[in-house]
C-alpha cells in the first residue's frame, strides 16, 4: 500500500484526485502501476486502477491477469470493478472506503457479486486511515 500512496502523491502535479494503484504478479512483484490521470489526459476512464491494469497487461503480454492482485488506495468505483473482473484479477486490496461510489462493498459489491461470471476476494481498510487522510488533504482546500 505504501507504493500506492506514493503513486497517489504524484497526482498533486496534475491536479488529479490522489488515488494510486499497483498490480502484483503471483510472486508479489509489481507489474503495473497507475495513478489517476483524468485531468492530465482529459480521459474519464484514466482511473488509477485502469491505468495499472493496462500497464500490467502490457508487461505480461496478456490481458488475463489470473493470479494477480490489485492494490489501490481507494475502494474501486463501478467502472474500475468491471475492469478488474474483466481482467480476471482474483484479489483486490484497498485502503479507504468510498461511501459515494464504492463497488467493493460500501455502496455496491460488484467485485463479489455472485450473479457475475467472475469475482474477486476483497481485503478492505488496509492503511485505510492513511489513504483517507491523503484524499481529505486534497479536497479540504477545494471545499
Pin down the residues of each PLM region.
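A short, polar/charged loop-to-alpha-helix boundary motif
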Residues: 40-51, 55
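Immediate flanking context of iron-sulfur cluster ligation sites
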Residues: 62-74
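Zinc-dependent deaminase
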Residues: 1-14, 30, 76-143
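Small-residue (primarily alanine) positions within well-ordered alpha-helices
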Residues: 4, 8-11, 21, 32, ...
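Conserved catalytic cysteine-centered active-site region
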Residues: 59
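Residues that line or immediately flank small-molecule/substrate-binding pockets and catalytic motifs
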Residues: 38, 72, 96
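Short beta->alpha transition motifs characteristic of CBS
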Residues: 31-38
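Short beta-strand scaffold segments in enzyme catalytic cores
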Residues: 19-28
Amino acid at each position: 500500500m505504501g507504493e500506492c500512496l506514493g503513486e497517489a502523491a504524484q497526482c498533486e502535479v496534475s491536479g488529479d484526485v490522489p488515488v494510486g494503484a499497483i498490480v502484483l504478479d503471483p510472486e508479489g512483484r509489481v507489474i503495473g502501476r497507475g495513478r489517476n490521470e483524468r485531468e492530465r489526459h482529459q480521459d474519464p476512464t484514466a482511473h488509477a486502477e485502469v491505468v495499472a491494469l493496462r500497464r500490467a497487461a502490457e508487461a505480461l503480454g496478456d490481458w488475463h491477469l489470473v493470479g494477480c492482485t490489485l492494490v489501490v488506495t481507494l475502494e474501486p468505483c463501478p467502472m474500475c470493478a468491471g475492469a478488474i473482473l474483466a481482467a480476471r484479477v482474483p484479489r483486490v486490496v484497498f485502503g479507504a472506503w468510498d461511501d459515494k461510489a464504492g463497488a467493493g462493498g460500501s455502496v455496491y459489491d460488484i467485485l463479489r457479486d455472485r450473479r457475475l461470471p467472475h469475482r474477486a476476494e476483497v481485503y478492505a481498510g488496509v492503511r485505510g486511515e492513511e489513504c483517507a487522510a491523503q484524499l481529505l488533504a486534497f479536497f479540504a482546500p477545494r471545499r
